[in-house]
């Protein structure tokens, strides 16, 4: 991912110019994908959730996930810690996580994860992407705009489920609960293999929020869409070699569109 418009970002780009020609541009997205975004009466109430750190539009590669710091849900019964339900899965030597959750009552369920910091040597940053997804259950339609209280978070201004292809998604980028003027937001579609981007700029869409931190994007294809608000962290973190390095903080939300 990128941190647009910061001196630190510009400096890192200058240092990485030698690699840029050889390595295609690729945005990191923390995925948190449920089996469905809407649970209906008579439907399956047991939700499978997949947590993967990857490049969704390019269908990989998958990056190795450390054990998440926290994983939970904010629902009609309040907040619950779901970290004990996580199961680590490995493919091609890279770790991802899965979990199951039993929906028991009507309401909206905001699933969220704080992943372990990820070291990206190509950009010289530690990456922490606070990610959430909202599932509506049994037609209640209440609670979809609840905020978790993550350090960086997108508050939806449009109900983030029950969306048709072409609908406009709007949200507010917040840091520590306050809107972030002119925040950078990256958008990617979770590619099912049916689309080959004609050039790198088509892989990741880039939005600049307005002075109130509000952004909007019309989703042109059915499937899962990831919105990632990217900010520079206030404090450095140590990389695997113990050196303090900048931090990319992300607030992500996933929404799904369906064809009419």
Identify what each model region corresponds to:
Residues 28-48, 124-183, 189-193, 243-260:
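Beta-strand-rich domain onsets/edges
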Residues 12-24:
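Bacterial N-terminal signal peptides
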Residues 44, 95, 103-111, 164-166, ...:
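Short tyrosine-centred short linear motifs in exposed loops/low-complexity segments
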